[in-house]
Regions:
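Pol beta-like nucleotidyltransferase catalytic core
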Residues: 1-49, 53, 59-161, 168-267
């Protein structure tokens, strides 16, 4: 059995069931906690970077400057993955699965968080549409007034999805929930998402400022004409099944993918 010691736990519950104190344990440093790793203990230490670079830039700079402080680095980050001791991990999960009738056109959901540039972009787009008819806007607060994913996805053909960072494979529940509810994402996010999911079922733009122009086209030509296009329908079904592995918790996927690798650290 793998044993972990978490250092400076910043997210309650991560590895909790895998963290009994043990003399023969892997030292896990994640996100901002990487600052506490010591070079002399590198053979027993791993770094797990879950939040994106836009949220914890200093942690990424630290690991990038000191990759030798860790036996292994687990991350989605394209730069850090260039190191020989780095391995990819994605903590995205599907929160909701439905195959309901699509009776509404376009939605967007945002919280009040404005900690990074793309948080601000999401809020700006939501504010632009809050008094317009083209998009149904859902405002929630992650701490006091959360919005259920079902509310803005289940019956919607399209939903605006802006990730918190732009990188090759930084994708989260934001787009995975779209795939699992057969909602087409109007997407700003992972630049290589097409290597994991069917791009014909994604309306991807490079910059969030392009979203209104795309919305105008969808509205002018009709959401149904896009959504029920045979090519789009085939891609929607394809992505619905491609996202199935993400219904497994990211921790279970992590242990499945890297359990044997970590066992060797303890032998």
């Amino acid at each position: 059995m793998l044993h972990f010691k978490e250092h400076h736990r910043l997210y309650s519950g991560f590895f909790q069931e895998l963290c009994p104190e043990s003399d023969n344990a892997i030292d896990v440093y994640y996100d901002q906690a990487v600052w506490y790793a010591k070079k002399e203990n590198a053979k027993n230490q791993i770094a797990i970077l879950l939040e994106p670079r836009s949220m914890i830039k200093d942690a990424y700079l630290y690991v990038g400057a000191h990759p030798d402080y860790f036996k292994y680095i687990f991350t989605h980050d394209s730069f850090l993955l260039s190191f020989d001791n780095a391995h990819e991990v994605n903590w995205g999960n599907v929160w909701l699965t439905t195959d309901s009738e699509k009776t509404k056109d376009i939605s967007i959901c945002t919280s009040s968080k404005d900690w990074c540039p793309l948080h601000k972009a999401r809020i700006e787009i939501a504010n632009y549409y809050k008094n317009r008819s083209e998009v149904d806007v859902f405002f929630g607060d992650w701490n006091t007034k959360p919005v259920e994913a079902k509310d803005y996805l289940e019956h919607y053909k399209f939903s605006i999805v802006i990730e918190n960072d732009i990188d090759d494979f930084w994708y989260t529940e934001k787009i995975l929930n779209c795939f699992a509810t057969k909602t087409i994402p109007i997407y700003v996010g992972a630049t290589k998402i097409s290597e994991r999911f069917n791009p014909s079922g994604i309306c991807q733009v490079k910059d969030w400022n392009e979203i209104p122009a795309l919305i105008d086209i969808i509205v002018r030509l009709g959401a149904d004409s896009f959504y029920y296009n045979p090519i789009m329908q085939e891609a929607i079904e394809d992505n619905f099944y491609r996202c199935v592995p993400y219904k497994i918790s990211w921790k279970d996927r992590f242990i499945h993918d890297y359990g044997q690798l970590l066992e060797k650290m303890m032998s």
